[in-house]
Structure formats: structure tokens, C-alpha cells
Amino acid sequence: MSGETEIDDPEVSDGASENDYSDHEQELDVIGKEGDNQEMAEQKVRPDGEENGNTVGATATVTKPKFDPKDPLRPRRKKARRACFACQRAHLTCGDERPCQRCIKRGLADACQDGVRKKAKYLHDAPPEALRPVLGPTYNQQVSSNRATAASTPTEPSPGMGNFFSQPDTSPSYPLFGANQQGQMPPPLQNRLSFGSNQPSPISPTFHTAGNRPAGMQGISLPQVSNDSHSAFGGGAFFDPSNPALFNFDLEGLNFGNHYGALEFGMLGHMASGSAETPPQDSSAGMPQNVGDLGFSNNSAFTNNPPFNQIYSHDSLPDFAVGLDRPNGGNVFGNNNPHHGLPHAYAIATSGSQHSPSTDASPAASTMGFESSPTTTNYPAPASHRPAKRQDTKSGPSGKLGPSGILGKRNRDPSSIYDTVHEPYSYTTGFHSLTAFIQKRFSPNKTLRIAKSLASIRPSFISCTKTLNRQDLIFMEKCFQRTLFEYEDFMLNCCTPTVVCRRTGEIAAANKEFTLLTGWRKEVLLGNEANLNTNTGSGGPPSSGSSGRGSFTTPRMRPVNLADSNPNGKTQPIFLAELLDDDSVIEFYEDFARLAFGDSRGSVTTRYKLLRYQTAKDTSQSPEGDKGKRKDIVGFNGAGIGGMGNRIKEIDANNGIESLQQDGKVDCSSCWTIKRDVFDIPMLIVMNFLPCI
């Protein structure tokens, strides 16, 4: 009879159970087997009486279509995430709904519950509640009358789930934004906050809003973690993805090059602020545990001049305000203490226009906020909280300092480099100008030595650049500007006199220490102002590089600097050869020819003589009068430094340097290296100088 009893294929499950069951579960097993036998009897295709030609009408049923078990195109049932206990014991396909259709058909709806699987070895220490499946959209909460009653109570957990999961019908609502602000969130931010909004997370704690709060804090939501979820996690609540206030920090204002880096930095700052591990406090304190959950609205609590006593009482100040000075009532964060250090970690959780207290307290921070950096998304922020821009920035000391002088990299955006660079840099013109300058300044013998050094690397330059098209050259210039962007930040915090130049020798960047050492102002070095230097280092004794041959004894009439040879009067960056004396220039280009296409990580350490910046007016003054003038300046600044160091209004950059120079030269020890681009071509030269005392 084995050929006559065929079980319908869709009712057979593919996998076998791996569970071990106790004796008290055998009753359900017997009930399941009896139902299976009844189902098999009803699904017989051909009864015994049909073989003899007698058709039995009582057993004649509608024949179900047969499907070949080996046919890959046969219809299959969708497997459930986890089978119920009865279907698991009977090895039949179950569904996601509870109770499942098979248990309803067999009358086992009350006993239909998820089966227990055998744990893997690495999950032996995990609690059973953490291994439960994520409930699908077809999950039926109203199993029976008693289970529906248990699910309707928010404080009583469902059977078998413990205190780990929050019920979908009791998901909290976060009153972060007012009624008039709904739907005004930018689309990019909505996409980032879309996850976890339609379905509760399995690790989401239940947030309850405190009912008692001061009268001045009615517009601020105060979410607190419930005791059940707090005890389930062992002391601290996890991050709730369904809470939009948890991720309410401006990613664009953090000035990261990518979204994931800004999100990671914001989460680390959120954890460092202690908001995720602060235990629940009494609701009478009136302050939220998470500063990121504050709902800033256009009420009187955050105006420019709020009454302090109406906002915060003395016993309701949060923990983050301990390190700040208590203001006198003018504003929330006082600026009487200039030594409270860097902004706290909670400052990153606010929007881009809400500056940290230490930044707002400084007089030079009004024109250097986060609004100065170009962003692709405009986030709406309360206009009353944005500080007003100063109109007299040039009168104070903040007008002399650039945006990078106070905030450094925070208000700079490297993405502007890729938007502004559209043309390749003309290195051919730079080399032609360098050749013209060398021929007009140096003697023929020195010019020949420099020309030999440049001629030795000329074929390598030609072979590396002959296959590059216009797009490659533009990309090369973008790489140069992006690398220079990083070096400018390094030079801002480096106290060593440093200069960065292109492979043609044109100055691209210099820090203020180099300006103090040589007297060359940054505007002159970069070609923004005319070069009036008359110091070429030729006033001293003859150098060792000069030749005594008679053919080169005829002097050459040449201009003092390159600006005199430019007929159009157009300024250009200063060459490195204009900053060094004759012997130093020759030595530099000999080392450059050896290092340009040699060791990619090599460096040169030697001694050079830098030329001080001197104009015709400086050389016409007598040394005696200049020396007496400097004595007066030293006496004025010395009194300020000794008594009131913080009240110095002006510092003479020449003090102390005059004793180091001799004949307009400063003997320095230099260490420099070459940075190459992606095409393995020398891109820029980084040089450090230290004066030899």
C-alpha cells in the first residue's frame, strides 16, 4: 500500500528538528500525529474500491494536482522565520502568523507558540530573549482573549518575551518638534532618519515622558528610560534608532569629507557626553538626560537676553554646566571665564548655527562660525539663537587673523578645491621664468652648474608627462591643492619655519615663523604684492662657486629681481632661488636632481643661507639710527612682556633676528623632502629651517 498513500508535497517540510523535548510535551505530539493521520486518509488519490471498478461516492473528493518533487518549477510555500511547536514536531511547514493556519485547523490555536531551537556553541551564554525572531508584519497580536488582554497592558510584558522587547502598539511618540514644525525637516535628513520609524527595534527601550517639570521647561521634552528596560540592559540604555532626537546633530556642520565619518564622530561625542549611560533621575530635577533631545523652539527660553532665573533654577542645572561660570543673567552661557577650555562633547549634537560656549565667548568667533564653510544642505535653525555678525571686524585684532587662525580646519572645506580648479597649472611657463631669473642673477659659471642639474632630470619629466592629457593635468593640480590643504593645517600648528614650493621652485605656502625669520611677508612670497627686495647676497666676499676663467670675467648687466624683468608688471610667486644665496642655490639644485626621481622617501639635511627681505629704503638707513630705534622698541615691549604679557599690542618681528643675520643673510640648518603625485612626478617641496645660533 506504499504506492497508494502519497502525501501532498507542499505539506512536507525540508528540514528536521534538532531539539530535545521533555516528557510533558508528548501529549501535544500525539495530538499532532492523529491530525496528520486524518489528513493522510483524506488525501488518498485512489481508494481500494476503485481498483475493482466500484466508485465510492463517499470517499470521492476533488483530486489535487500532483507535482513532481524534483521539478524545480513546482510551487513552494514560503518558509516561516520560526515554526511553531506543533509544526516543528510534525515536520510540517508553518507560517509567520500566530496561531498558524495548521494549528487553527487542528484546534490547537491556544497552544500555538514558537518552537525552541538548539543553541549554537557560541550562543550558550546569550539569554533566550535575545535570540527571539523579529516579528513580521503578518504577526497577529490578538491570539486569544487572554493574550490580547496581556498585550494591551503596557507595563506587563508578553509571555515568553520578558522585559527585552517593547510592544509595537506602545511605541513612544517623541515631542521633539512642535506642531508648526512638522514636515520641515530637509529630505536628506529624513532619509537618514527613516530607519526604525515604521517598525520597533528589538533593542529599543521604552521612553516615558516625565510629567512633573518646571514652568519654564514646558517646551522641552524630557525622555527618561524606564526601570524595566534599564535593568534589562544592566545599567545603561542602548541607542534607540526610532528616536529621531538621538541623531539630531548637524552632519554637514561637522565638516567631514564623508557621511559615515561624521556619523561616527557624532556618536562618539554623544557617548562621551554621558547621555547614554546616565541613570534615570528624579523628574523634579527638570533637566533631560540627553542634551540632544532638547526641542529648541521660538519661545522666550532661548532668546538673546533671557532672564536667567526664569529658565534655570540653582538646583536644576545639569552636570555639563558645572565646569562653566555662572552667568550674571545676560545669557545662558557666560563668558567671564576665558579658561574653561574646549567645548564640551555635547556641543556636536546641536545644529550648525548653535556654537559652543567657548567659541561664542571669543570676540573673533562671530565671523568664523560654521556658516562660513560651504555646505550642500541648508538646515533650518532658529534665527534668534544665531549670533549677529560684527560689522567692525577690521578694527579689532580679529580682522587681521584669517578664519584658519582661530578655528583651524573647522571652517575649511576641501570640497571647494574640486569645484574651483578647472585649468591645469602651466609648469612650462614656470620653468621658463626660472631659467630667465637664473640667467639674469647668477654668473655664467654658476648658471652652467644649475643648468646641468636641471638638464639631468629634464628627460624624466618629459617621459612622465608626454602621455598625460588635459584632464590628467587638471587632476594633477587638484592633487596638489588637496595636498597643500593638509600641509597648511600642519604649518599652522608647527613652530618650525616652513615653506612649501612647487617643483619649479615657486613658493606655494609659508608659515608665520618663516616670515619672522626672513622678513619676507606672505603676500610677497605668494605674488600678491610686488617684490621690492634688493638683497641678492652679492655684497659679501666672492663665493666659492665663482670662476676665474677669462672668458667669463665680463660682468653681465641684469636686473636686481625678477619683477624688474617683467614688462607687463604682473606679479608672480617668489622662486626659492630668490630666498637663498648663490652657493645655497647651486647646492639645492644638485640635491634636487639627485632626489627628484630617486628615493621617493628620501630627505636632505644641510645648511643654507637665507636672504633677509630688504628694500631700498631699508638699505639707505644708517645702522646707528636703526640700532637706536630698535632699542626703544625693545624697551617698550620688554616692559609689557615682564609685567603685562597679555596686554602687548604689537610685537616687533625683527627683535632677536638682527643678532643672527650677517650681511643680510641668516645661516640656517635645513631639512627638506619631495612629495610626489599619483603619476610619480615631483609635486611639491617641503622645507624646514632652523637658525644656527
Curated annotation (Swiss-Prot):
Keywords: Activator, DNA-binding, Gluconeogenesis, Metal-binding, Nucleus, Transcription, Transcription regulation, Zinc
Biased composition (Acidic residues): 1-12
Entry keyword Flavoprotein: no
SUPFAM superfamilies attached to this UniProt entry: Zn2/Cys6 DNA-binding domain
SMART domains membership: GAL4 (SM00066)
Record-annotated DNA-binding residue ranges: 84-112
GO MF assignments: DNA-binding transcription factor activity, RNA polymerase II-specific; RNA polymerase II transcription regulatory region sequence-specific DNA binding; zinc ion binding
GO cellular component, one term: nucleus
Disulfide bonds: none
Biased composition annotated in UniProt, kind: Low complexity: 356-367, 394-408
GO biological process, one term: gluconeogenesis
Cellular compartment(s): Nucleus
Composition bias type Basic and acidic residues, residue spans: 21-49, 65-74
Biased composition (Polar residues): 52-62, 144-155, 275-287, 369-379
Region (Disordered): 1-75, 144-170, 273-299, 350-413, 531-567
Family that this chain belongs to: Belongs to the ERT1/acuK family.
PANTHER family registered for this protein in UniProt: TRANSCRIPTION ACTIVATOR OF GLUCONEOGENESIS ERT1, ZN(II)2CYS6 TRANSCRIPTION FACTOR (EUROFUNG)-RELATED
Function, as annotated: Transcription factor which regulates nonfermentable carbon utilization. Activator of gluconeogenetic genes.
Name the UniProt record assigns to this protein: Transcription activator of gluconeogenesis BC1G_14637
